[in-house]
Amino acid sequence: MQRREFLASTSLAGAVAIAGCNSLFETESVRSVPDVVEDRPDAVYFPTHVEGMEMIGMTAAGDYTIGLMYSFPHRFWTVTGTTTEKVSIRDKDDIHLMASVWDDETGTVLPVGSGLSMTVEQDGEVVTEKPPWPMISQNMGFHYGDNFALDGEGTYDVTLDIGSMNVSKPGPFEGRFEESASGTVEFEYSVDERDGLRFETFENQQGERGAVDLMEMEMAPVSVAPEPDAMPGDHLTEATSGDAVFQVTAVRDPSFTDGSGTYLAVSPRTPFNRVPLPMMSLSGTVERGGEPRFDGALSKAVHPDIGYHYGALLDGIESDDAVTITVDTPPQVSRHEGYETAFVEMDPIEFTVS
């Protein structure tokens, strides 16, 4: 898969707390990564552990705001098609760097279609440079991240280069986020400070259906899809495929339709936390009286009222129309533990408009 397409939001506080989970955790004084759960469901499940993280800093870059944070090195899984592959922690890995991007004007988490790269420098010399993976994790949601090897303790500069958004931008975002941008954040790395981050395990819940709560966010938006009754338009259906929850609406708002037709908006999200699922390929059909009214791809899109979603402009939609949404490619986004077995094998969604 390509290391590109979506960024999440995060807190701008110094140390990031996990909300609502303390009673479920046992804090370890010494970090020891547990083995992966053997009998994992093909669904979202409680991971073996969760790790704290700390905000390094933030910077403005063109129309974007970037937040950078770090944690312990993580194991994670990449996805290519319907195949997942575990990425283990290397002995030389020192930290897991994570980047988040959002729009300050609307508080909307933004996809960056042409990718993101990170360059880590010390005293003007490049230590490492690579494009981080687009990821989802239960406590953070969407972010770009990867494990990095540093050159000992000290001061580092992390430069983030952001590409333009190559997704559909109906409404207020039309014409914005067209240019590439860059921002640099200074980072003081200390082993003691890293090792002082929280590291908490699930002793009894690991492997069970459920999810860790998203982090508390103070100064930054949260990458959460809206509740069904908060989505614009007429709600058509809620359905589940591959453990993802799909909310589908028909929107006639001119900011979506340019004044004509009906916009079919499809919002896939994780169960429990409603984290939007990016980097999918969806297509759909609409039939009326057995005759095709639409047959085509749904475009990746972002709008302040829905966030990241998939949509298509129709000439209209009526009661008794038969709608099918097909997942041509599941989310090609890397996953932290607890998400790697879900959202892989995904059946079509079929419903009749009531």
PLM region spans:
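Alpha-helical, hydrophobic structural elements that either
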Residues: 212-247, 269
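Short beta-strand elements
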Residues: 172-205, 339-354
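Compositionally biased low-complexity segments at domain edges in trafficked proteins
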Residues: 192-226
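Hydrophobic alpha-helical segments
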Residues: 1-78, 85-170, 187, 243-248, ...
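Intrinsically disordered, low-complexity boundary segments flanking structured domains
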Residues: 51-57, 173-175, 231-238
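Flexible internal linker/loop segments at domain or repeat junctions
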Residues: 237, 247-259
